[in-house]
Each structure stands twice: as structure tokens, then as C-alpha cells.
């Protein structure tokens, strides 16, 4: 089972392919850090335009020699994040999902961070406590199950 993940919530365009048996088998990231540096922070309109111009290249780099038709489902960041940037990722994911006739899974950016340890440490037992620091979001949370059952203890 292969999942293609798309992340465009702020200033990085990232795509990875995750295989349930092999782990990450393809990935590519395009960073906008240098582009925004002269402004002292992320400019949302510039971020959106850059996602638009780079997302196909990032997909091709992530796929490398993995056939697009071998992808079983597509996950994408649905928020929180910059609205325009999120819409680029969602629209791209919807187009691929429709073209390939495969499921589309919206993923909350923060929940993605909370559950990411499970990719590396599959033996991790629930519940577990997470410290999350991501952009403007910081929190301590308890993750109870894989089914979006998280409790924020502090933020």
C-alpha cells in the first residue's frame, strides 16, 4: 500500500511516497526560505505562487522511478496554514485523486505532527505525550488513538 503525501501549508512544497512495508520510498522538498528572507518573513501571495510553479517538479522528483499508477491513496495537508498555499496542495491532490481514481485523505497539519512518531517507532504504545512546536503553533498533547483522539494539555 503506497500513500502519496502532499504538504503545502506554508513555505515548503513537499511530497513523499510512503510504502507500508518499506517506509519512505520517495521524497522531495522545495524550500522558499531564500525567497522570503528579504521580506523578513513569509509573504503569503508569493508562497502560493511558488507552490503553483514548483509542485509538478517536486512530484516528479519524489516519484523518480516509482510509477504514479502504483499509488493507492493520496493524503494532503488540509490546515492549519496559509489559505492560498493550502488550496494549491488540495487542488493538486484532488486532481491526482480524480485522474487515478484513488482515495483522497485530508490531514490536519498538527495531527500529522502528533502522529508522525508512529512512522519511526511503530512499537510506540498509546497513549503518549507529545510536545509540538510548529510555526505559530505550540502545544503539549496526549494522543489516545490513531483516530484523531488527542487532548491538548497546554498551548
Over which residues does each language-model region extend?
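N-terminal beta-alpha supersecondary unit
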Residues: 2-70, 76-80, 109, 113
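Short glycine-aspartate micro-motif
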Residues: 3-5, 73-75, 85, 128-132
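Short beta-strand scaffold segments in enzyme catalytic cores
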Residues: 13-18, 130, 138-142
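Short Gly/Thr/Asp-enriched flexible loops that form oxyanion-binding sites at enzyme active sites
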Residues: 76-100
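Flexible, glycine/proline-enriched loop segments at strand-loop-helix junctions
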Residues: 82-84, 102, 128, 147-148
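Conserved phosphate-binding catalytic cores of ATP/NTP-utilizing and phosphoryl-transfer enzymes
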Residues: 102, 106-129
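Conserved small/polar residues in nucleotide/adenosyl-binding loops
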Residues: 145-154
Amino acid at each position: 500500500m503506497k500513500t502519496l503525501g502532499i504538504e503545502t501549508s506554508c513555505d515548503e512544497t513537499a511530497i513523499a511516497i510512503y510504502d507500508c512495508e518499506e517506509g519512505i520510498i520517495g521524497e522531495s522538498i522545495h524550500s522558499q526560505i531564500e525567497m522570503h528572507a528579504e521580506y523578513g518573513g513569509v509573504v503569503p501571495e508569493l508562497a502560493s505562487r511558488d507552490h503553483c510553479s514548483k509542485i509538478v517538479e517536486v512530484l516528479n522528483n519524489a516519484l523518480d522511478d516509482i510509477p504514479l499508477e502504483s499509488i493507492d491513496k493520496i493524503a494532503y495537508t488540509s490546515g492549519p496554514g496559509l489559505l492560498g498555499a493550502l488550496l494549491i496542495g488540495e487542488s493538486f491532490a484532488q486532481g491526482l485523486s480524480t485522474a487515478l481514481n484513488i482515495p483522497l485523505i485530508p490531514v490536519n497539519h498538527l495531527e500529522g505532527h502528533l502522529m508522525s512518531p508512529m512512522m519511526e517507532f511503530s512499537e510506540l504504545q498509546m497513549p503518549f505525550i507529545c510536545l509540538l512546536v510548529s510555526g505559530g503553533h505550540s502545544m503539549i498533547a496526549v494522543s489516545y488513538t490513531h483516530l484523531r483522539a488527542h487532548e491538548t494539555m497546554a498551548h
